[in-house]
């Protein structure tokens, strides 16, 4: 399960369904979940291509990469993709992918996220940056945060883990080094927040997270976009293409502008951290 990605999918289906209904048309969705497996992404994309669908929505970086590599004649909209230039290997990315690809980005304001570390853990002299090395978007976010911290005179060190096998050991290293820990928007982290929490909470090390789903599992606070709204935005782009003949090659990547400061009440209490009044409590989702 990956709550953020599921929210984006639901937003997409709701928005496109509504736009189609308004136009007196119906839309059929073929929902396939690759569970973050690259080989499954490739297989699913192959099936979509063979069925000659009108549009492919690719949720998350691995899905977008698989679709963009295999399909050139069907419009592809990405969502929950952090940095399209990094994901698709485009040098000097200017905001528009071109060809048959566009979509929405879940990139948060990284400077503001970095500043949160300094605001909430003012005594922090060293910050550990924990992320999955298999995700290029995570590396991008971590470098930006490190740059900001360095300019503020705060030391940081990267703690990349390869997969779930070494996550616990690497998280332990991060918790031993850092006065605080930053984890970016990262699919592997999102699926393994319990492991990270089990290591870091007993050591009383606060984690600032790139998005709400991760923060709800192991963080103290986040500046998070709404993945549902990101999906809605993607669905509206799909409607422009399918109903109004918009040219996807000219559509710039869109960003969500509804980011909110949120906090995990349980972990903040456990670590004795008080957040400013403008922070909104993360509601635990019913299992």
Residue ranges: model-predicted function:
Residues 84-126, 225-246:
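Hydrophobic alpha-helical segments within soluble ligand-binding/sensing domains
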Residues 12, 102-150, 247, 251-267:
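An alpha-beta-alpha
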Residues 240-287:
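Hinge/cleft segment of the Venus flytrap/periplasmic-binding protein
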Residues 136-211:
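Pocket-lining segment of extracytoplasmic ligand-binding domains
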Residues 26-50, 160-175:
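Structural motif
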Residues 1-14, 30-39, 188:
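Extracytoplasmic "Venus flytrap"
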Residues 9, 13, 41-45, 53, ...:
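Extracytoplasmic/secreted envelope proteins and their assembly/folding machinery
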């Amino acid at each position: 399960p990956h709550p953020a990605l599921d929210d984006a999918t639901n937003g997409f289906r709701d928005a496109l369904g509504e736009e189609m209904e308004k136009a007196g048309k119906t839309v059929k969705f073929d929902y396939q979940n690759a569970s973050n497996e690259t080989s499954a992404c490739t297989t699913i994309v192959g099936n979509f291509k063979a069925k000659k669908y009108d549009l492919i929505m690719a949720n998350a970086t691995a899905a977008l990469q698989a679709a963009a590599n295999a399909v050139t004649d069907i419009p592809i909209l990405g969502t929950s993709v952090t940095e399209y230039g990094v994901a698709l290997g485009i040098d000097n990315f200017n905001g528009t992918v071109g060809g048959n690809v566009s979509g929405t980005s879940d990139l948060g304001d990284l400077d503001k996220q970095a500043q949160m570390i300094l605001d909430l853990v003012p005594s922090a002299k060293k910050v550990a940056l924990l992320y999955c090395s298999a995700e290029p978007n995570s590396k991008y976010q971590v470098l930006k945060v490190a740059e900001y911290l360095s300019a503020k005179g705060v030391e940081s060190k990267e703690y990349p883990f390869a997969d779930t096998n070494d996550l616990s050991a690497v998280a332990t290293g991060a918790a031993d080094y850092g006065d605080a820990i930053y984890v970016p928007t990262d699919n592997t982290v999102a699926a393994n927040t319990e492991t990270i929490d089990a290591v870091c909470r007993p050591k009383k090390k606060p984690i600032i997270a790139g998005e709400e789903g991760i923060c709800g599992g192991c963080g103290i606070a986040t500046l998070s976009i709404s993945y549902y709204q990101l999906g809605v935005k993607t669905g509206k782009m799909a409607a422009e293409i399918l109903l109004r003949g918009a040219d996807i090659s000219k559509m710039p990547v869109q960003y969500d502008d509804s980011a909110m400061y949120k906090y995990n009440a349980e972990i903040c209490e456990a670590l004795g951290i008080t957040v400013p009044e403008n922070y909104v409590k993360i509601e635990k989702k019913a299992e």
